[in-house]
């Protein structure tokens, strides 16, 4: 099984390198450059447009979009919504990072509006963010996961099962970053043990 996953992953990576897809990113000002560089490193070509007057045209022309909810001020709300809706219209893949979900009432209202009006291909966040998306059962420590939510060898099976059930309910892939990463659809959950404690000391590793 592991060999098959590695082979499939290598083929996907090679395909990205060959096609060099243009990926539209709505990021936050803390990690915009890092996210653009990570897209380049993976073989894609980033565009970071976030003006509401152009995001629909940009998103429709790209191979897919990533919406990062790190900045909910002013025009970002409209830009995220327009980007999400046009991706749904043209049936492009759409990744959503609900940064800080559960941290503040305003941010939660922005989140609810997006989830109500946009379907996401992938929702990825730390465990506290994902649990808030799923059932409002967790409160993030700012944009970091709450200590009591973090995955361990004792709790990872329950987290994986939660991710599968949430994936089925929302009809989306769920990716949870943490000490042990979880990537799940309704049928399977994969655990990735490639993390390091130092990653939590560098801002934006989840965004990337």
Would you name each region that the model predicts?
Residues 1-81, 86-88, 93, 160-208:
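Small-residue (G/A/S/T)-rich helix-start motifs and N-terminal tracts that mark the onset
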Residues 51, 73, 104, 152-155:
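Intrinsic-disorder/low-complexity, polar/charged segments
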Residues 76-125:
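Glycine/small-residue-rich loop that forms an oxyanion/phosphate-binding "nest" at active or ligand-binding sites
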Residues 107-189:
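Conserved phosphate/ATP/ADP-binding segment of small-molecule kinases
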Residues 99-103, 129, 180-181, 196:
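Acidic, glycine-rich active-site loops and adjacent beta-strand->loop/helix elements
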Residues 65-68, 93-98, 142-146:
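Short beta-strands and strand-loop turn motifs
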Residues 55, 96-100, 124-128, 204-207:
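Short C-terminal domain-edge/linker segments immediately following a structured domain
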């Amino acid at each position: 099984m592991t060999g098959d996953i590695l082979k499939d992953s290598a083929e996907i990576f090679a395909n990205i390198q060959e096609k060099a897809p243009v990926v539209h990113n709505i990021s936050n000002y803390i990690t915009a450059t890092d996210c653009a560089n990570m897209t380049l490193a993976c073989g894609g070509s980033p565009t970071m447009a976030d003006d509401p007057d152009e995001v629909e045209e940009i998103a429709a022309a790209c191979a897919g979009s990533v919406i990062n909810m790190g900045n909910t001020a002013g025009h970002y709300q409209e830009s995220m919504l327009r980007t999400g809706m046009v991706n749904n219209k043209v049936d492009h893949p759409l990744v959503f990072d609900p940064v800080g979900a559960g941290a503040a009432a305003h941010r939660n209202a922005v989140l609810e509006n997006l989830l109500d009006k946009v379907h996401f291909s992938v929702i990825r966040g730390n465990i506290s963010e994902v649990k808030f998306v799923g059932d409002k059962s967790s409160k993030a420590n700012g944009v970091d996961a709450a200590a009591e939510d973090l995955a361990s060898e004792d709790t990872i099976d329950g987290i994986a099962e939660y991710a599968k059930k949430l994936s089925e309910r929302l009809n989306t892939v769920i990716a949870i970053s943490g000490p042990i990463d979880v990537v799940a659809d309704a049928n399977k959950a994969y655990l990735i043990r490639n993390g390091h404690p130092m990653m939590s000391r560098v801002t934006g590793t989840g965004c990337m």
